[in-house]
Structure formats: C-alpha cells, structure tokens
Amino acid sequence: MSYYTDLMKKDVISWVEPLLSAGVIRCRASDSKFELQNVAAPHKPPWHYIRTVIGAKCPYFHRLFDDISPRTPAGKFVPRRCQECWKIVIRPRTIKELFALEELLVSKFDWPCKCGIERRYYAPLSKHRYGGYIYNTSMKQGLERLAKIRKMLKEHDTLNEVEAYLKRGCTEMEMGVPNSNSWTVSEEQKEVEDILDWYFLFDVPSSGMNEHILTRLHMTWIEWAAENGDETYLEYTDGKPIYEPAVRYERKVEGTEAGSPDDKTVSISPTAGEVPKGIAQTTTRKRKKK
C-alpha cells in the first residue's frame, strides 16, 4: 500500500469538508478539533426530554450518518452507538392521552425517555400525531421494560388502549439503511469511528428541561391538538376553542331557525340592500362632473 493510499484512509478533513464549508462544524483554534455549531436547545421543542441518555451525542450521530459516513472509506453506515439503541415506542392517540403518558413517565420510572408531538410527516407516529420513547441499551433490556410498560398501560384508566412496541435506532436510519435486524459494524467502520471520536467534541445536554421551556412546550402541544382536529384539547381550555371559529353566512329560509351560536352561523334575509347588524356597508359615490 502506498503512502498516499494510507493517507486517504484517515483524511478526516475530506470527510467533513462540506460541513466545515457550510459552517455546521468549526475547527477549534486551540487544538484543531471539531465542534458542532447548531446544537442549541430549541425554545419551542416538540418533545419533553424527561431524562436524557447518558453520553448521548445524537446531533453528531445524525451528521455522521447523513453527511460524513458516505465520504469515508467505510461508506454509509449506521453509527455503532445507534445500533445499540433500542426504543420502546408508545402511541398516545389524543392530547389527553399524551398528558397522561407524560405524568406516568415522570412519576413511575427513572428510565431515559421523552414524549411529545410528532411533526415528522414520514415517521410511523405521524398517524397518531403524538408519541413517547423509552431508551434502552440492549434488546434484552428493551423487551423486559416493554413488558412492564404494557402492563402499566393496560391498568391505566386513560392509557389502557395505547399501543407500545420495541424498535431499533432512529427512524431516519431505518429509512436510509432498511431492515435494522441486519445492521452490523464492519472493521472499516470501527476504524473510521475511532478516528472521528478523537477529533469531535460534544456538548451533551443535561437531563430534564427548565420550567419556562415546559410552559411553552405544553402550550405548543395544546395548539397542535387544536390544529389537528383533536377535540380533547378542550379539556385544557375550559371548553373554549383556542382559535375563534369563522362567522358563517347563509340565506334565511322561510320557517327555519337562525344558525346555532355554537357554529356562529348568521341567517341573512334576502331583502335587497339589507346588511346584518355589525357589518359595515360600503357605498359608492358618483364623481361630480367638472
């Protein structure tokens, strides 16, 4: 093997060059190691990160999967840490069930988990618009916890019809490299990840979320429910809609009642020139001849 070929096997700069050029990562002046630049905590997150996975580097792993690995000698691969990530997926169907699940996850377990609204149109949860995830480090651990959570869901007054199952890795990785039961870690991948692990620095998020973020989060959940036709959100607004319904106008039919105040329908008499009360009437003036 030539010296040049040997250099190509560890040419980290070429692997990450598009991300450097786009400003997604920067090369630190003190030691030339790489830092991700776009990992700030969102101020309007869809998820309640109840307890985070210790040592989780998810923003980096997604960049590694999508942008870096295809440029390495190993080709596109699922990061080895992600192959060890087993998730219990819980599918609440309404905002009422989501709040009940949140309370259950906060009070009954100490497992790493999150729950919230599913905005990704391609995700399996999008059918129900809400979801919960419990993170596990092995299939064995995941299956043991799945049995426990299913039992608790079945015995819960609100969550007794909610589905739960076990999956491997992130949805995006399952889509990019289908059939997670066939994922493996090659020797080339190990070499690439060993090199990158040394060069990348991480700001791992702390567990939990502060009160001001949770306040906005719960408002976002309720607004999402209202926007997606989930009327159980009315239980959190004293039965009042968040968004005022439009006033509807229909021609008055002889012998019928006016529209219900609930749907704000106004019956208008067909008499020419009549304008309903509260509606401004526009008049057109003729210009005087000079």
Model-predicted regions and their roles:
Residues 102-105, 144-157:
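Short amphipathic alpha-helices in soluble, non-transmembrane regions
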Residues 122-138:
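Histidine-centered divalent-metal-coordination microenvironment in nucleic-acid enzymes
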